């Protein structure tokens, strides 16, 4: 018979098992108990919560892992954070941070005594208390784990440029079936052991999801091993259900994998690295609901999907369930774990690491406390020189790329800035970055490859999920970054944005959570210039999605030209605790504002462009507004036509950069008051508004405004194909000719005076259609149009 390794002494084995039992006891108590936290009297229904909420099934495994990580952190003085992919096992994170003391340090009313334990139990999944997941309220958490799939990308993002940090990342076997998680395994091809830390993936195979078996738990051991070998890992399998045996197996395996991690890093830091090493990982196979009730009402529960949430759920109807719950709680022998005052007994207190080595106190999990300010060049140095508006063209994002290049250069030593994108950095005209840094790449390279190196700082993988997960992990641990993406395909991470915005919303309400750098999106290759890729690439709806979140968390910017984009980029990279969405084109387009004017305009977020207006002597007859670079071009072209043909028509031109200025100041901190809004848009004049996205969003933002009844919005209305740039605006009635027609329709006194102009506009639309169908490009008067002041 083979003798199993015994890395733990009998005393260590007894203590680590007791510590695990303590965490399990506290976890069950959180799910069930209102009172009688140490079972000092027989358990009754009055001691139990009326609504039982929580997830037991994954929790004992999370507790098991946490206890063993504590051992090696304390022994080896490791710098480690814990990422719980199955974040629905929130009781485990609360229990362990309570045992190590960090929870009570942040929440003194949750003291380490009987009263504190009672409060700890009562607050869990209870009105006025805390949620059921690994929420921001839990010290040490950077990953809530409510929506599954992002644990591994968060872990890798956290250790980029953190050479001493290890992220122990527990991946649930249900989560492992998600697309984002499946791709995130490839993050090992982007992890440089010279200047990055390490990720220790721990795949927790407990066999079941909510009501189904998991795929990875039902394939052969050989296939499972080959799968992760194929991903480039060295898997170590730890499996069983006898606690004492499993403690020895887990301890021995952790000793081995930590030695391998140290060896990989030591070799790389001495000799350099050209390809990714084979990092170790652990596959932990334990029963779902381990140590819980074996059966409930005669049905298998431990080791079954039935233990996923609350194994005993009908206590009011079934008194025998109360007896079974008490037996379950007493099976952990709490009298051995806590003294009569409710404190963890002293011998077990020595198992937790000390100070900031406790995973709940690790400063990397409160990244704002470590954040260094970005060194930023003066954005004014990159200004496009403007003598007259609308005379020269520039590629706005290319100008932005030069600015980002120099930000990258200034922060190379501090290693706290990266740019992320799904194979689109060059396409989005940010290629200047490659003047100072390549793309990170540790897989095979070929002689013809360009801009690939192990030490690059541009992160590209064709997975929007992985890009955002990396960036979120990077930001949450105190660094800075930018995510550039095609506008239509940012929808792939709609729900990831949701989760991060929710995290920020809650974090702002927690005094000890320090502000982190904002998550900055650059959305380009946008709807109006996806004429070459066609309908599938045309969708501006991410803005509509973002705007649903809390006003103090989101910002949306639509800079009309390069100088405005420079100002907005600088502003966003300096901001904290926001999600900033910047929408800007990459194609050559007319430029409008010199830098001084751009700063003034963007500081306000909205304003009258006096040089394009002619209502200075009195009230306007019509207000024509625009938001977005292409709508700005079409509005100004329409204004030039109107001023040429109807010189007596008084026109006010308004440009909106900060979309949230349209909302009322009671609803958004950037919003205008009614007085300010009415001063700009009047209380009774027609408003023609050309907007980058779906037009109903403008109505939604302004529906309470005095003059909303006179507001007419043009924007994208799901008409598109592979066609010319100008035809995209025509298909959606947002072109200059339709806008002129809209003005004629809505200014009452024009009437017959504008009949000839209306006919010209309709003829122009026919001429446009005939021309593009014949020549395959826009008419010269469209392609070559420039602003001329009448």
From Swiss-Prot:
EC numbers for this chain: 4.1.2.-
Cofactors (names): thiamine diphosphate
SUPFAM superfamilies per record: Thiamin diphosphate-binding fold (THDP-binding)
Keyword Membrane carried by entry: no
Domain of life: Bacteria
CDD domains assigned: TPP_PK (cd02011)
One term of GO molecular function: aldehyde-lyase activity
Classification via Gene3D superfamilies: 3.40.50.920, 3.40.50.970
InterPro entries per the UniProt record, alphabetical: Phosphoketolase, THDP-binding, Transketo_C/PFOR_II, Xul5P/Fru6P_PKetolase, Xul5P/Fru6P_PKetolase_C, Xul5P/Fru6P_PKetolase_CS, Xul5P/Fru6P_PKetolase_N, Xul5P/Fru6P_PKetolase_ThDP_BS
Swiss-Prot/TrEMBL keywords: Lyase, Thiamine pyrophosphate
Pfam families in UniProt: XFP, XFP_C, XFP_N
EC class name: lyase
GO terms (BP aspect): carbohydrate metabolic process
Family according to the record: Belongs to the XFP family.
Protein name, per record: Probable phosphoketolase
Species assigned in the record: Nitrosomonas europaea (strain ATCC 19718 / CIP 103999 / KCTC 2705 / NBRC 14298)
Lineage of producing organism: Bacteria, Pseudomonadati, Pseudomonadota, Betaproteobacteria, Nitrosomonadales
